[in-house]
Amino acid sequence: DELLQKIAGAVEQGFPRIKLKFRPGWDLPMLRRVRQEFPHAVFHIDCNSGYTIRDLDLFRQVDELQLAMIEQPLNHDDLVDHATLQRSITTPVCLDESIVSVRHAEKALELHSCRYVNIKPGRVGGLTNAVKIHDACRAAEIPCWVGGMLESAVGAAQCVSLAMLDNF
């Protein structure tokens, strides 16, 4: 009930999208209840690498709930299983912790491991690498999402600068 109240407050304040943490034991029943209470809200879930490809049936059920994306559902270093998952569901997979370098991003794009990429400049080696990842994603027609990791004001400014590029 507390979660539903917080979501109601966010919806009332006009937040365009709501991100929910999704983990074993706090997953499908919770998400179904949220969707039932807020049928028109835009949600995405962040799994923080909490699942494996053996949970494919769970993600097929999540697919029915019409989410904007599923962020980092599987282990961060398993781009192959992310590709298998993305081919098996219609909801876009967004890679986050998997994107630690330009090379990792290029490999994810090559394997079709996702349909969104969350770029964190602090994780990928700074703004120059973040822009290279953005450009590779744009060329592959994969939209980007910018995230932060509790940066300083300088780091936050990098995130804002990056978010102004055309593929965000």
Predicted regions span which residues?
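Catalytic domains of carbohydrate-active enzymes, especially glycoside hydrolases
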Residues: 9-21
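Active-site glycine-rich loop that binds ribose-phosphate moieties when present
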Residues: 2-6
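Short helix/strand-capping turn motifs
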Residues: 167-168
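Catalytic core of soluble alpha/beta enzymes
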Residues: 20, 25-157
